[in-house]
Regions:
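N-terminal secretory signal peptides that target proteins for export/translocation
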Residues: 1-3
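A residue-level marker of the well-folded mature domains of exported/periplasmic proteins
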Residues: 5, 22-341
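Sec-dependent N-terminal signal peptides of Gram-positive bacterial secreted proteins and lipoproteins
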Residues: 6-24
């Protein structure tokens, strides 16, 4: 009997222990997710699905103009649609070639899946593009092309044709004769070269009675461009037309025309959009401008990079289009979505 009592006592203790274990197990359950969350936070910031996304840095020519903000919006939309991660950056000024090269070097060091680049100086980046090629990193150009076969594609406006259209409009508006000046953002990027040459060559070929008296380069800087334009207007009191090859350039021209009281005397034609240009066109101070499709440029460059990574073929040149706009169509359904303030 004594042994029986001992056995019963042991069985009772085991039963109590089992009951206590059963009661305390649910209390421990909430701790598992908390522990899991802490582990995920310390091991890697992105979720498991995000870690598998291709990373594509997008390096632009600048960040200061609304044009680049529109390109950024397009590239971000493409990233969301196509399930890739991007970063978008550019130097503070479109004259900072060295800064852009540093950005490209930093991007290469991260070993990205691909790189989208709008080169400020097409020759200065060749060595880094060759490095990317040796690492198997595809390069997609946007806005500006590069004088190299390394980029698999370039999403861009046909700037030569677009600037030629601006020249045709200028000739029409000044009556086919007179003095005209040109203000360009730079002479090193593909856009600067092509817009200058597209305008100048069209005038030379088709309008022998129009004289281009000056070509300046203002780095897209408003103050510098204003000073350059004022000097040209003061040196040429009979100037009939002024072409600005990007938003920063044309703002300088508009500032100069306004400050010198030349509104209505000089036909002003610009490129891109932005609030100051749009207001000037509506007010009649500016005749019109060429608009690109900046959102489309941003979207198409990321899309081309993703297609390349997926083994799909892409066109070497992706023409994103251009349009002439003035007071008659600035608010039209065709033009309005392409403009930005």
């Amino acid at each position: 009997m004594k042994n029986s009592r001992v056995i019963m006592l042991l069985l009772g203790l085991l039963l109590i222990a089992a009951m206590v274990g059963a009661c305390t197990a649910p209390a421990a359950a909430p701790a598992a997710p908390a522990g899991g969350e802490e582990s995920a936070a310390t091991e890697a910031a992105p979720a498991e699905g995000d870690a598998a996304k291709p990373y594509i840095p997008v390096i632009s020519k600048g960040f200061q103009h609304q044009f680049w903000q529109a390109v950024k919006a397009g590239s971000e939309q493409a990233a969301a649609d196509l399930n890739v991660d991007i970063t978008f950056e550019g130097p503070a000024s479109e004259s900072e070639v060295d800064k852009q090269i540093e950005m490209l070097q930093a991007a290469l060091a991260k070993n990205p899946a691909a790189i989208c680049l709008a080169a400020l100086d097409t020759k200065a980046v060749i060595q880094l593009l060759e490095e990317a090629q040796s690492k198997g990193i595809p390069i997609v150009g946007f806005d500006s092309g590069v004088d190299s076969d390394i980029p698999v594609a370039t999403a861009t406006t046909d700037n030569i044709a677009a600037a030629a259209l601006a020249a045709d409009k200028m000739a029409e508006l000044i009556g086919g004769a007179g003095k005209v000046a040109v203000l360009v953002h730079d002479q090193t990027s593909r856009t600067g070269i092509d817009r200058r040459d597209g305008f100048v060559n069209r005038i030379a070929e088709a309008y022998p009675d129009i004289e281009i008296v000056n070509i300046d380069y203002g780095a897209g800087d408003h103050l510098k461009s204003t000073d350059l334009a004022k000097a040209v207007i003061q040196a040429n009191p009979d100037l009939k037309g002024y072409f600005g090859a990007n938003d920063g350039s044309i703002i300088g021209v508009l500032n100069a025309v306004t400050e010198l009281g030349k509104e209505g005397e000089i036909v002003v034609i610009g490129y891109d959009s932005g609030k100051q240009q749009m207001d000037a066109i509506r007010a009649g101070t500016q005749a019109g401008a060429i608009t690109q499709n900046p959102i489309g440029i941003g979207y198409k460059c990321v899309e081309a990079a993703v297609k390349t990574l997926n083994g799909e073929s892409v066109d070497k040149i992706i023409d994103t289009g251009f349009f002439w706009y003035d007071a008659t169509n600035i608010d039209s359904d065709e033009i309005k979505p392409l403009l930005y303030e």
